[in-house]
C-alpha cells in the first residue's frame, strides 16, 4: 500500500531527528534542506545536523543532571542524534562532547542510506504547498523571512528574536602547555573516563583586571538590523557579561573553583579560561563560554592576553547569529501542531527550546507524533514526569500569563519536571544533609522518568500491534 510521505523542512538536528523517527516507524519522509542552494552565515558545510555553535551536548549523567536524563530518554527511543553523538564523542569531563565533523557526516550518511528517506536540496519559501498534508517545520534559528512572515500572517502573533553567539576555536599546537594544564573541574571523569578533559589557562588578579579592561574597550561588530534584539541568557557574549559587572566572568565561565594549577599548585588562580576538545584528533579546542561579538581583529588581540594563549592560532573566531522562535504556548497544541493549520507541526529551536539536545528532542517527538497519525494511531505526548514530557509541556503550555514576551527559550531543567520528596534519613537512620537530599532527589526523578517512559513506550507499542 502506497503512503503519502511526511515532509520535514530543515535539515538541522531537529529535522534530521524527526525524519529518522518517521522513517524508522515505517513511513516515507522527504527531508528538505536549503543548503547548498541557499547558504547561511552560521553554517560552514552542506551536511545535515551541522553543529554551528559549541560541540557539547552538556552533562551526560542521567542520575544527576536534567540534560543527562534527556540523553537517556532519547537513547531509549532510538535517537539518531544521540547515537551519532555517542559514536563520535571526544573527551569532555562529565559532559558529552562530539567531533562535529564526524558527527554531522554520520547523521548525513545514515539518513541518505535509509530506504524511506528522500533528501531534497531546495528552499521552501513561505508556507508549504497545500497538498502536503503533514509537514514538520524544523527551520531552526535562521528561519527564512518568507516563512516567518507567512506564519505571522497565519497566526497574528508577534515574532520574537534574539542573538546566539559563537565561541572561538584554537589550534592545540599553538597553546603554551608550559603555562596551561589539563584538568576537569573537581577532577570529574566523563563518559570516556577522562578526568583531565579540559585545558586550563590561569590568570592572576592583575591579568584578569587588564583582560576585563581590554574586553570592555574592544570594538564590537555592529548588527544594525538586529540592534534592539535581546540576547538569550544561556549564550551571552562575554563582553556583555563583563558589562554587567567586572566580577561576572570570574563567577561564570572563568570561575577558578575545582582547579589546581599543575605548574604552580601552591598558587590559586584568580580566574581560569577553559578550553574543551572540539574534534576527535584533539587538534582543535574551543574556548568554553567565550561566545563573542567582538570584531575579529579585536578578538585575536584580546584573547592573546590570556596566559597560555599568547601565540594562539585561531581556526575559527567568534561571531553571532540570529535566533527566531514562535510563541509556542499560544500557537501549538499538545502534540506540536499549529492550531491555525494542524497539518503543520513545528520542531526544534523555532519552538522556543534552547540547546542542541533539546532541539533534537522536540524533533524526535514531532517525528513520532506525525508518524503515529499517518499510521492511524493516536499521537500521545510522553508523561510530564519525563524530561521529554517536561520539555514539551513547557513549549505547549508554559508561560501563557505575563503579557508579550513572557515566553522565552528554555533549556531542560528539573524545574520542568514534577519534583519528588527525598527521604529525610539514610538507611542507617542518619539525618541527610541538603546536598545529599538533592543528589538523592535527582536520582529518584531520573528513575521515575525512565520507568514512566518505558510504560509510555510499551503503551504505544501495544497500540501498534493491534
UniProtKB/Swiss-Prot annotation:
Report keywords, A-Z. Cytoplasm, FAD, Flavoprotein, Methyltransferase, NAD, NADP, Transferase, tRNA processing
Record-level Gene Ontology MF annotations: flavin adenine dinucleotide binding; tRNA (uracil(54)-C5)-methyltransferase activity, 5,10-methylenetetrahydrofolate-dependent
> Which Gene3D superfamilies does the UniProt record give?
FAD/NAD(P)-binding domain
Top-level EC class as recorded in UniProt: transferase
> Where is it located?
Cytoplasm
Q: Which GO terms describe its cellular component?
A: cytosol
Q: What Pfam families does the annotation carry?
A: GIDA
- EC number of this enzyme: 2.1.1.74
Primary residence: cytoplasm
The record's Gene Ontology biological-process terms are: tRNA methylation; tRNA wobble uridine modification
Query: What InterPro entries does its record include?
Result: FAD/NAD-bd_sf, MnmG-rel, MnmG-rel_CS, MnmG_N, TrmFO
Binding-site positions, FAD: 10-15
Q: Known catalysed reaction(s)?
A: uridine(54) in tRNA + (6R)-5,10-methylene-5,6,7,8-tetrahydrofolate + NADH + H(+) = 5-methyluridine(54) in tRNA + (6S)-5,6,7,8-tetrahydrofolate + NAD(+); uridine(54) in tRNA + (6R)-5,10-methylene-5,6,7,8-tetrahydrofolate + NADPH + H(+) = 5-methyluridine(54) in tRNA + (6S)-5,6,7,8-tetrahydrofolate + NADP(+)
Query: Could you tell me what this protein does?
Result: Catalyzes the folate-dependent formation of 5-methyl-uridine at position 54 (M-5-U54) in all tRNAs.
Q: Which family does it belong to?
A: Belongs to the MnmG family. TrmFO subfamily.
Name used for this protein in its record: Methylenetetrahydrofolate--tRNA-(uracil-5-)-methyltransferase TrmFO
- Originating species: Phenylobacterium zucineum (strain HLK1)
What would be the name of the gene that encodes this protein?
Answer: trmFO
